[in-house]
Swiss-Prot record:
Upper lineage: Bacteria, Bacillati, Bacillota, Bacilli, Bacillales
Cofactor: Mg(2+)
Record's protein name: GTPase Obg
Organism the protein comes from: Listeria welshimeri serovar 6b (strain ATCC 35897 / DSM 20650 / CCUG 15529 / CIP 8149 / NCTC 11857 / SLCC 5334 / V8)
Entry's Gene Ontology cellular component terms: cytoplasm
NCBIfam families documented for this protein: Obg_CgtA, Obg_CgtA_exten, PRK12296.1, PRK12297.1, PRK12299.1
Residues annotated as domain OCT: 351-429
Known role: An essential GTPase which binds GTP, GDP and possibly (p)ppGpp with moderate affinity, with high nucleotide exchange rates and a fairly low GTP hydrolysis rate. Plays a role in control of the cell cycle, stress response, ribosome biogenesis and in those bacteria that undergo differentiation, in morphogenesis control.
Subunit structure: Monomer.
Residue stretches making up the Obg domain: 1-158
Amino acid sequence: MFVDQVKIYVKAGNGGDGMVAFRREKFVPNGGPAGGDGGKGADVVFVVDEGLRTLVDFRFKRIFKAEHGEHGMSKSMHGRGAEDLVVKVPQGTIVKDIDTGEIIADLVAHGQRAVIAKAGRGGRGNKRFATPANPAPELSENGEPGQERNVQLELKVLADVGLVGFPSVGKSTLLSVVSAARPKIAAYHFTTIVPNLGMVDAGDGRSFVMADLPGLIEGASQGVGLGHQFLRHIERTRVIVHVIDMSGSEGRVPYEDYMAINNELEQYNLRLMERPQIIVANKMDMPEAEENLKEFKTKIAEDIPVFPISAVTKTGLRELLLAIADKLETTPEFPLNEILEQEDEDTVLYKYIAEEPDFEITREPDGTFVLSGTKIERLFTMTNFERDASISRFARQLRAMGVDEALRKRGAKDGDIVRLLDYEFEFMD
């Protein structure tokens, strides 16, 4: 499979901090708490744009950071939420988390959206914590940190046009003269063993992706040579360009080559023959090519287009490229297996996700107890340690989660050091 890959870093926006404030207005005694909530940060969202064909843009920009939410304000005013950072990607992009190997998203349809990095929610202001027992709380929350990830983008590049033909008929040479692709070219068979892709400009503002695929031989549909590898590539294309050596320079008969290739395509997948074919009579600059072309045309249907060219002398190329572009405009995508696709649409996939514990405790060689876990780390980062009331609330939350009891069971005693992220504190029994 011809795959474009690139690694990037994404960071969603942090939530804004909540505020501790009180209402102080003339003639309003005991105004009460009036600290607003912080705004939500911005998600990093990938959106499919059918106009994009490659991941080349990501090779010049690899870091994407979304904006943070605004902090809460006095007079119970909430901070503004940040607008999502929208990143456009081509159809067929797969997004993987590099650290876990998880497939985050498989983006296949135009306009499809996926949140790649989730923003942090805004912290609550002190107005949210008012209770009858504590009508004037002096505590607030920090904004939740936004998610950050190192991700790998993989694009299974879908070629619009596939060049088919026996080895050494001139497929690589043709691709090299109509695009910026530079495939290996030599006068021996199987020079091309992996697909080469080129972006082709038809010369009238239209463009398409052409693939020079490994040479096909008889028996390919049964896996002979590079058969199955070749045919898996060609089934993803919309138009097949059949390149034939019309000079017969290696003792081959053009019409027999034409029939043999089509036979392999038909045996591998009947639907391959539904794709429109354009026949390219290559090497027309060679002796006997004209005579062979006349004989060839008498053996095929009159409505099958044949374009005589010479990839070496670059003659006949413009007419060929315009014809390919015209054919692409009227050719839809070909589903490989409609029954399978219908079954996929009706199938619900249930995935088991193990429940993550609230916290875990480990002990280092120096005796330090280390707390970790998504929930406990989120509580820590959202605690405003500049306020005594917030610190007391954090201690109560740990106690309610069972952290104190779990530390005692692990042997923690008064004065032992407990670490959570970069913060260390003493255990008090």
